[in-house]
């Protein structure tokens, strides 16, 4: 290499490493010595002693002399590599950066132009290989990732390029699976055009609002840099970014027109990178080969529209678990351009993850992390592509994506990534730059509503309003929380009387009401910096959310849990049969927003199995399978899913019941939490905690005792009390509600907790004492068996056993037994009569005297 190029190489090396901590090893300044040559491929590695060798940890940068041309080429050598068996100098892995890479970056002409709207060839995606004046390439010379991952082979290996999946798109069907109903066309009356002028007011209540895009405005370029520093940076037109993460994991999807770069990194799991580009674009990995021989990243063969690359820890090891995952997720982008398809499968995978955890089959479900995150990322990519190809976006599409991200990400981060419950986060700005406008609008709409008038509207209107609040409001709105509380209270009144039909609308209304009231765990702060108004709102939010948690717990009766479990069994049967279209909201239940943790216990599982329709036994593969799984595991799965609080993206029980953590005493495993009075809760456990006023129930299976504790905020003392058996006074003659604020609990001698009914008004109180005429099934003693019992928990900490329910036992005597008893009684009377007659007759006639005289 000539002296100018040598100076440039030195300048580039010095410039790049000057931004990082370095140390140098002084060497002799004598002329270059080439007495010791190390041959690497067709090049020679030598020490150039004319300048210091700059080192950064294990990374060494030096020049390479080409044997044929006697010219130097700038390169990076990674020393002391543990995972390579190649016998290179110092055990190093070496790749070249050719001197042509020092030229200024060059791009195709389309980068300076705008794509034609609706043209599939519109995306302009380029792979750049320039170093000079290109700050984006700095990580390639500084990264330590190359020390850890095998992503830079010199030649193709087996499985580097693999066959396309059978589920992906074909030339005859380039867009893949499309779900029903078809995508709605723009409505002229509800269309907002992006023409560069101030946008008109966006109606976020109308789900059919259309946002027409002017792609001429989307000219911002995105430069994608591989986290492995293994693929040269790729440029595309920016479309958005989707972020998902927690305290242990982060996934970022960089979206461009016709492009996606997904990066998944985790403390507990290996990383994975997926790149999607147009099928005529060739991404290039960084290795020592010249450009004409430079490899593409691993992945399947190109499809009719896209080409997919996947880099992971398992690229070199075909038997590796990550190798299987890489091949699976590589098919996702080409299976469908319908974002609903990917959201549906993300929901199904989430359900399968929860079911697997609940069944006890496996405690490690980390492989779901890659599958679910990849599905969600591809869903946002598919939506961005459909918007690009059609030039419009339905507001409903943006809301759907946002809702599913908020619903699924906390679950996958908690169970698959091992993150803490409160640490998850997610965001996406795909083709939607009016979130602030939408948020301001929904706040105004909610502030102006009249709650009494709103409650008179049909349920589908409630769903639209609460759905918008859930999607766009990042903080709880006072009116929305009050409205949600009133709405859930009305649903509770119908649910405890078994008069509610849990169709999809009712399930979604309950979910969005709970989510809109709870917010994103930013509401319950109470510190000295809060103003009076903020303090008042915080207290109201806490009080109403405690009430909602209590009402959902009360709605989760034993009978409802069984019916909800059957619904889940039906869904899992469809999952096994290969069903596609699904949302977790279809199986949402009050139990999933409650404070009941006992539904996975054996008694509740057996109750569920006893009512499963026979048709499901075949679908669920009953009988002993190869792995020993029976229908019983599906029962555990269903009830375990009911125990997941999917309505919250944080630990709602901990946040809404701070009294449970106000002392250092750790509670035993909790079955139920009942937040009654302010800063006071009942906690039901199997073992007595060392805190609170504690009651132990008599007449319960000693293997599964029931312990009730009344815990007050800040009171860390422990005391024991006895449950008294009483007959309740009839409160019908009083206008006041004597038992309001109390909780009625029905339980079995086996230790199973059946129902927990909250007495919130006079009507429920009257039903409590109505006996057999009660319209609330749990209050009807005629439905009780001798093994059932009931008690009442008052808000002041008093617990009483209800004698009227304990002593009521109705026995049905068979008629044959009754008539046989009557016949036996008559026969006994007849025999007794004969005996008495004989005795009396003998005495009167002096027969006994004659008998004695005869002797």
From Swiss-Prot:
Q: Where is the signal peptide?
A: 1-19
Topology relative to the lipid bilayer, per the entry, is:
Single-pass type I membrane protein
Segments carrying the region annotation (Disordered) are 174-195
UniProt record, GO biological process: fusion of virus membrane with host plasma membrane; symbiont entry into host cell
List where the protein spans the membrane: 816-836
Task: Give the main localization category.
Answer: virion
Q: Which InterPro entries match?
A: Herpes_gH, Herpes_glycoH_C, Herpes_glycoH_C_sf
Highest taxon listed in the record's lineage: Viruses
User: Where is carbohydrate linked to this protein?
Assistant: 42, 48, 52, 68, 126, 189, 217, 503, 679, 773, 796
Query: Cross-referenced Gene3D superfamilies, in alphabetical order?
Result: 1.20.58.1340, 3.30.500.50, Herpesvirus glycoprotein H, C-terminal domain
Q: How is it modified after translation?
A: N-glycosylated, O-glycosylated, and sialylated.
Q: Which residues lie on this side of the membrane: Intravirion?
A: 837-855
Q: Which residues lie on this side of the membrane: Virion surface?
A: 20-815
- Keyword Signal in the entry? The reply is yes
List the keywords (alphabetical).
Answer: Fusion of virus membrane with host cell membrane, Fusion of virus membrane with host membrane, Glycoprotein, Host cell membrane, Host endosome, Host membrane, Membrane, Sialic acid, Signal, Transmembrane, Transmembrane helix, Viral envelope protein, Viral penetration into host cytoplasm, Virion, Virus entry into host cell
Where in or outside the cell it occurs: the entry states: Virion membrane; Host cell membrane; Host endosome membrane
Region annotation Interaction with gL: residue ranges? Answer: 247-310
* GO CC entries: host cell endosome membrane; host cell plasma membrane; membrane; viral envelope; virion membrane
User: What is known about its subunit structure?
Assistant: Interacts with glycoprotein L (gL); this interaction is necessary for the correct processing and cell surface expression of gH. The heterodimer gH/gL seems to interact with gB trimers during fusion.
Protein family membership: Belongs to the herpesviridae glycoprotein H family.
Q: What does this protein do?
A: The heterodimer glycoprotein H-glycoprotein L is required for the fusion of viral and plasma membranes leading to virus entry into the host cell. Following initial binding to host receptor, membrane fusion is mediated by the fusion machinery composed of gB and the heterodimer gH/gL. May also be involved in the fusion between the virion envelope and the outer nuclear membrane during virion morphogenesis.
**By what name is this protein known?**
Envelope glycoprotein H
Q: Which gene encodes it?
A: gH
């Amino acid at each position: 290499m000539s002296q100018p190029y040598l100076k440039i190489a030195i300048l580039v090396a010095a410039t790049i490493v000057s931004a990082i901590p370095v140390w140098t090893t002084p060497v002799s300044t004598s002329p270059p010595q080439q007495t010791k040559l190390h041959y690497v491929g067709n090049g020679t590695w030598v020490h150039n002693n004319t300048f210091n060798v700059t080192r950064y940890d294990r990374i060494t940068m030096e020049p390479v002399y080409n044997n044929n041309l006697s010219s130097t080429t700038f390169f990076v050598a990674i020393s002391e590599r543990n995972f390579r068996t190649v016998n290179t100098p110092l055990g190093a892995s070496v790749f070249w950066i050719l001197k042509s890479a020092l030229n200024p970056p060059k791009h195709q002409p389309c980068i300076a132009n705008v794509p034609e709207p609706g043209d599939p060839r519109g995306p302009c995606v380029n792979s750049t290989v320039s170093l000079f004046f290109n700050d984006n390439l700095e990580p390639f010379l500084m990264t330590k990732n190359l020390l850890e991952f095998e992503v830079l082979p010199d030649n193709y290996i087996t499985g580097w390029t693999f066959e396309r999946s059978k589920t992906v798109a074909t030339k005859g069907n380039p867009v893949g699976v499309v779900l029903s109903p078809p995508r709605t066309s723009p409505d002229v009356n509800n269309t907002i055009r992006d023409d560069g002028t101030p946008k008109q007011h966006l109606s976020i209540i109308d789900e059919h609002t259309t946002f027409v895009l002017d792609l001429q405005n989307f000219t911002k370029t995105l430069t994608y840099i591989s986290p492995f520093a293994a693929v040269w940076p790729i440029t595309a037109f920016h479309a958005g970014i989707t972020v998902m993460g927690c305290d242990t994991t982060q996934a970022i999807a960089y979206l461009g027109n016709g492009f996606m770069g997904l990066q998944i990194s985790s403390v507990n799991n290996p990383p994975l990178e997926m790149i999607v580009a147009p099928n005529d674009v060739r991404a290039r990995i960084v290795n020592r080969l010249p450009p004409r021989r430079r490899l593409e990243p691993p992945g399947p063969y190109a499809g009719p529209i896209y080409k997919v690359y996947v880099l992971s820890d398992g690229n070199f090891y075909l038997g590796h678990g990550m190798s299987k995952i890489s091949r699976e997720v590589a098919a996702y982008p080409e299976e469908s351009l319908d974002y609903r398809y990917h959201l549906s499968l993300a929901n199904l995978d989430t359900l399968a993850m929860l079911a697997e955890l609940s069944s006890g089959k496996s405690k490690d479900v980390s492989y779901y992390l890659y599958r679910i995150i990849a599905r969600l990322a591809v869903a946002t990519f598919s939506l961005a592509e459909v918007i690009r190809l059609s030039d419009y976006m339905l507001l409903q599409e943006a809301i759907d994506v946002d809702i599913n991200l908020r619903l699924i990400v906390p679950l996958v981060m908690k169970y698959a990534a091992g993150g803490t419950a409160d640490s998850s986060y997610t965001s996406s700005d795909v083709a939607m730059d009016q979130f602030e406008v939408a948020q301001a609008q929904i706040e105004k709409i909610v502030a102006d509503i009249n709650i009494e008038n709103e409650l008179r509207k049909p349920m589908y209107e409630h769903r639209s309003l609460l759905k918008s609040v859930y999607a766009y409001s990042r903080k709880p709105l006072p009116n929305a929380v009050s409205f949600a509380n009133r709405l859930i209270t009305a649903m509770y009144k119908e649910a405890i009387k078994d008069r509610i039909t849990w169709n999809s609308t009712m399930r979604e209304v309950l979910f969005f009401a709970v989510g809109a009231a709870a917010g994103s765990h930013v509401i319950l702060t109470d510190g000295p910096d809060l103003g009076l108004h903020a303090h008042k709102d915080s207290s109201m939010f806490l009080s109403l959310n405690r009430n909602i948690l209590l009402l959902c717990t009360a709605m989760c009766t034993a009978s409802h849990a069984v019916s909800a479990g059957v619904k889940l069994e039906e869904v899992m049967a469809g999952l096994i049969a290969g069903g596609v279209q699904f949302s977790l909201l279809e199986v949402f239940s009050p139990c999933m927003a409650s404070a009941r943790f006992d539904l996975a216990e054996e008694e509740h599982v057996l109750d569920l199995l006893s009512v499963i329709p026979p048709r499901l036994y075949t679908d669920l593969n009953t009988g002993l399978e190869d792995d020993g799984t029976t229908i019983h595991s599906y029962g555990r799965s269903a009830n375990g899913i009911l125990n997941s609080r999917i309505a919250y993206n944080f630990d709602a029980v901990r946040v809404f019941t701070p009294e449970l953590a106000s002392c250092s005493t750790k509670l035993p495993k909790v079955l139920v939490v009942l937040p009654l009075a302010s800063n006071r809760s009942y906690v039901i456990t199997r073992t007595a905690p060392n805190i609170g006023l504690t009651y132990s129930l008599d007449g319960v299976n000693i293997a599964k005792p029931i312990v009730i504790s009344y815990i007050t905020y800040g009171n860390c003392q422990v005391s024991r009390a006895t449950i008294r058996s009483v007959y309740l006074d009839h409160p019908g003659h009083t206008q006041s509600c004597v038992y309001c604020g109390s909780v009625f609990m029905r339980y079995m001698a086996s230790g199973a907790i059946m129902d927990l009914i909250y007495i919130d008004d006079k009507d429920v109180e009257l039903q409590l004492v109505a006996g057999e005429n009660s319209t609330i099934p749990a209050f009807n003693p005629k439905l009780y068996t001798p093994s059932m019992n009931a008690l009442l928990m008052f808000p002041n900490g008093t617990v009483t056993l209800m004698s009227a329910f304990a002593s009521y036992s109705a026995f049905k005597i068979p008629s044959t037994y009754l008539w046989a008893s009557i016949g036996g009684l008559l026969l006994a009377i007849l025999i007794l009569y004969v005996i008495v007659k004989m005795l009396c007759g003998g005495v009167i006639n002096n027969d006994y005297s004659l008998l004695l005289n005869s002797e």
